[in-house]
Amino acid sequence: MYRPSCLSYVLLVANMWSFAVCANAFIYGSYDPSHNIPIVALMTLCATGLWLSTSVVSFGIRYVRVRVSPEKTQNRTIYVSSGLPHFDPVYGVVKKCEPMGGGPAIELQVNPSWIHLLPTSPAINKVEVGQESAILGSTYSVVETGGEPKSLVAVKSGDSTLGFGARVYHEGMDVLMVPHHVWYNDKPHTALAKNGRSVDTEDWEVEAACADPRIDFVLVKVPTAVWAKLAVRSTKVLAPVHGTAVQTFGGQDSKQLFSGLGKAKALDNAWEFTHTAPTAKGWSGTPLYTRDGIVGMHTGYVDIGTSNRAINMHFIMSCLVSKMETLPPELGYREISLEDVGLRSFEFLEVEIENRGKVKLGKREFAWVPKGKAWADMLDDDDLPLPPKMVNGNLVWADAQESFDGALPLNLLAGGRTQCLAAQIELGDYKFSCGPTHETGGMPFRNCGSSTCKFREVSRKPVADAVTAATKVFPELSELGWPERGSGAEIGSLLLQAGKFVPTKAPSNLEQAYNNLLSRYPRSKPLACFRQGTWSFDAIFEQVVSKATSAEINQKASPGVPLSRLATTNKDLMAQHMQFVAACVTGRVPLLASFEDIHALSPTEMVEMGLCDPVRLFVKQEPHPSRKLKEGRYRLISSVSIVDQLVERMLFGAQNELEIAEWQSIPSKPGMGLSVIHQADAIFRDLRVKHTVCPAAEADISGFDWSVQDWELWADVEMRIVLGSFPPMMARAARNRFSCFMNSVLQLSNGQLLQQELPGIMKSGSYCTSSTNSRIRCLMAELIGSPWCIAMGDDSVEGFVEGAREKYAGLGHLCKDYKPCATTPTGQLYAVEFCSHVIKRNKAFLTSWPKTLYRFLSTPRETLEDLERELASSPMWHKIQSYVRSIPSPDKTARDKSICNGYPLDQEAISTSYSEYSSKSASAEATREAACCAGAQAYPSWGIHGPYCSGDHGEA
């Protein structure tokens, strides 16, 4: 596919101008011999025509020179077993075999070491030579000529097929994606083949490669003329999603192809995953296709007959090969420093990427080894946006080498604000005043003014017709609805939620509980820019830019108050005002470190001083229970500004990332993913062990965020300071950030400002919300005497304590439910409810399926595959799946076409999920009796049949 370069656009503009000049001069008669411009324009048109002619001739010569020859194929004689094995007194176990094309039969002596494989053993599914494996219960389908993906290509060595690859798009160029062991095989590659046509391979340039069998890939720069001759198109590489249906392709040559279907299964390591699509000899490197593109590349088997292995090329290409400075946001890949590798408890895999360098890989993180990232040398230091400098009271974007220590940083204006922070405050155009106080019976709020940074107020979303129709089948949906929106709903719900706040004093055993909990968390290190006694503006600014461009920033989210006046999304804000945002953060961090008496400031004074921004309040658009809708108690989101989020990332990012990476060994679980069964199983195994120490119990805290106490937040920040080894200035900045955090100014959509009159309350949109809530929840369990606890936010499972509800009430938290977890008759742990999931041994499913289905039926963009990823393990899935497939909406069902090729999807290859409430899984479509499928004919000794196969061949 041709993509015009910048030069092409420049030439187009130049020629358009030249044509206009020539037309005006020679056609309309305004030519003046004394003017040189028409002559120059005419010369430009002539030169461009000559250049185009030369380019066409050059391409034609290259096109003609590329030789196309018939693909070499290998003729084989296939013998089919025509009877059961029998014992011969001379030769042992033998089988009678007949050639498929007819002819005399032969007797085959079975190797004694293989006799035990004759029954339906998984080992019989392994390919005779190589790393491929069929999957027990899987099927192969014949691919019609031309029905395979347009990007698929076979790699040949003479008449043998070494494997398969694909033409994929990568950062402005198309490359051949193929396994390293295929491209650099013992048999040299000689040609690329497609639909019986082949083109000889040459010594083409390699963009990147890795010989390690665990990261087995090569990206080859194949000339465009070769792709054109073979009619191969490019496709995109996508991130794999657990449970996604995938399709493999392969065969002995590029004309007679077969395909297999399976599902992708995520692993802890980002660079690999497993799948259940079958493969065969010569299928190495077959891309794993989904409806929208390629999600991986097959490299071998894991367990013979059970699962195959693939590498996540999205991770490889976007993190290890890409020359871009930012990472993709899809799956939270994180680049860490080599120093941080030593802080992880798990091992890292070190590999070398050709043309890139050495890199260490660990789960979802990676770190480049110094001097190993060769392509980084091509980046100029000047590529980094330069920090600002104050010159004569003005902000100048030029080289600046300023530093600051414990004194006020930079050149501060009156009131202790940097120039950028002053400009940020002016954007909000705050009109502070002393208004009336709203007495809620809990946390009081006072009207303190208004802001011109307002947000659109829209009406309540109507109930979709699809939801109304579905209530006849799923009456649970009638108990849900969309909440009201706008400032009226926000202030009403705020006062209701704030009424739950019950201020309490720190308990007497807080110090002991603090020390006990502290010992269960890993220790990190602060960013290098904070370790020195004197902070460098440039060092902090550079680190802020790195954080601001990371994949962890939600590009679609609002920047909050007041920067929403500059852009509606973080993506647009960073694209247009990156330097300004980075300068604000770089000014705010040392400003926080400079205040020793911040407790004397009111929330509005903190905003006026530039220490923090107002927190925007809005109603989350998710289905709410009807009882909450009647009460007007909606779920509120406290959107912390992007500047304050980046301040928190600078101060607490290292510790948060370490806790995410180490989630399996610590009480806090923000890093877990219950949609991946092996992670859910790891949680359950851990809980079963803890259950033997003290019986497990589930606690449901009502309105947790709105009942968080200031002493709980202080305990969390002090733990962060110790765990992160914060130097004095950084520790002061951290404490002051938390002081701003627990004494906030809230803003409604209409610009109304409200000030907290008491410290406390968790802000749901903070970068630290998940980690802080998890630690506070574990601290609460420690305070009431529970011997163990795991927590994800406000959800927890803990050791049972008598009178727990009353003890939690004494801490200021309303525990509306506290019950022991389900056990077996022998007392072993049977199931737990955690994070809206029921977790059992080797099983986890979402309990809030009505909300998920309600949202699905209300959103036309989602497909059945999206819904299946969330609810496939739910006991309700079969009923939901049957209903959704009956809806006359092709966008929702997508059931009639193959995932990428347009022919019918094999209903037996991917069975529906099992429900423990049904005696058997949903039956597949009835098979038809017919002649044996070509898949069984091609692989007769495997006992493999297609969906409509009579089973006449392949019997052992």
UniProtKB/Swiss-Prot annotation:
Segments forming domain RdRp catalytic: 694-808
Domain Peptidase S39: from-to ranges: 135-330
TM annotation in the entry: 7-27, 37-57, 77-94
Residue(s) at site: Cleavage: 132-133, 325-326, 402-403
GO annotation, biological process: DNA-templated transcription; proteolysis; viral RNA genome replication; viral translational frameshifting
Family annotation (Gene3D superfamilies): Trypsin-like serine proteases
Disulfide linkage: none
Post-translational modification: The polyprotein is proteolytically cleaved into several chains by the viral protease.
GO cellular component, one term: membrane
Keyword flag Nucleotidyltransferase: yes
Catalytic activity: RNA(n) + a ribonucleoside 5'-triphosphate = RNA(n+1) + diphosphate
This protein's UniProt keywords: Covalent protein-RNA linkage, Host membrane, Hydrolase, Membrane, Nucleotide-binding, Nucleotidyltransferase, Protease, RNA-directed RNA polymerase, Serine protease, Transferase, Transmembrane, Transmembrane helix, Viral RNA replication
Residues at the active site: 181 (for protease activity), 216 (for protease activity), 284 (for protease activity)
One Gene Ontology MF term: RNA binding
Domain of life: Viruses
Catalytic activity, EC: 3.4.21.-, 2.7.7.48
Protein name in the entry: Replicase polyprotein P2AB
Native species: Southern cowpea mosaic virus
UniProt lineage: Viruses, Riboviria, Orthornavirae, Pisuviricota, Pisoniviricetes
